Design a protein with these regions (language model features):
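Short Gly/Ser/Thr- and Asp/Glu-enriched loop/turn motifs at secondary-structure junctions
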Residues: 140-145
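C-terminal nucleotide
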Residues: 1-137, 148-184
Length: 184
C-alpha cells in the first residue's frame, strides 16, 4: 500500500471508512487455496520487512538505483499477475516459473541495493525445497526469517522437511485457511 497516502488520510477518516475506501496501489482479492500444499520453513533468524523495505527505498532514491527499483516494482507486479493466473488455472509449470522469477527479482534487487535479501540459510531452504520438487522462495522482504515452498505434485514433502531440519531450518505447522463451505 501507499504508506504516504495512508498517513495523510488516517486522521480524516474513520477506521470503517478507511477499510471500505479504495487504496492506491493495493488490491486485495480472495484466491482459492492452491492445489499444491504450502509449507513454510523458519531459518531461525528474525527479519523486519519494514526495515528491509525502508533500506532498499533509501538506497534507491534519486540515484541510478531508483530506475532499478522502479523496474523491480514493475516486474514484480507482472510476476504476481502471472502467478495469480497460474494458481487460478492450476498450472504447476507456470507456478514454478513465477515463484522462481520472483526469487530472481528479489535477488537482483538485493544485489543492486547492497542489502542481503537472501541469506545463506534462506538460500539453502530454497535449494532443499527445489531438490525435493517444490517451488520455493523467501517470504516477505527476505533478510533471513522464513521461506515458502509450494509443494507441487511429486514433491517429497517428508524428505524436504527432514532435510530442512538437518540444515537447521524449522518446518512450521501452518496451512492456508479454507472456508468450511469450500471444503470438498
Amino acid at each position: 500500500p501507499d504508506r504516504r497516502w495512508l498517513h495523510e488520510v488516517r486522521d480524516r477518516a474513520s477506521v470503517g471508512d478507511l477499510v471500505r475506501a479504495p487504496w492506491p496501489h493495493l488490491l486485495i482479492r480472495r484466491l482459492d487455496p492452491p492445489r499444491p500444499s504450502l509449507r513454510v520453513g523458519w531459518t531461525g533468524t528474525p527479519a523486519s520487512t519494514p526495515q528491509l523495505v525502508a533500506g532498499v527505498r533509501a538506497r534507491a532514491r534519486g540515484g541510478a538505483d531508483d530506475a532499478a527499483y522502479s523496474a523491480f516494482l514493475r516486474d514484480s507486479e507482472s510476476c504476481l499477475d502471472a502467478l495469480v493466473r497460474a494458481l487460478e488455472e492450476d498450472d504447476p509449470r507456470q507456478v514454478r516459473q513465477q515463484i522462481g522469477r520472483s526469487r530472481h527479482l528479489l535477488t537482483r534487487l538485493g544485489a543492486t541495493s547492497g542489502i542481503a535479501i537472501e541469506t545463506p540459510r534462506l538460500r539453502r531452504l530454497v535449494e532443499v525445497a527445489q531438490e525435493h520438487g517444490a517451488a520455493a522462495k523467501g517470504s516477505g522482504a527476505g533478510g533471513g526469517d522464513c521461506g515458502i515452498a509450494l509443494c507441487l505434485p511429486g514433491t517429497d514433502v517428508p524428505g524436504m522437511c527432514s532435510a530442512w531440519e538437518a540444515a537447521g531450518i524449522r518446518p512450521l505447522d501452518l496451512s492456508v485457511y479454507s472456508r468450511p463451505e469450500d471444503a470438498p
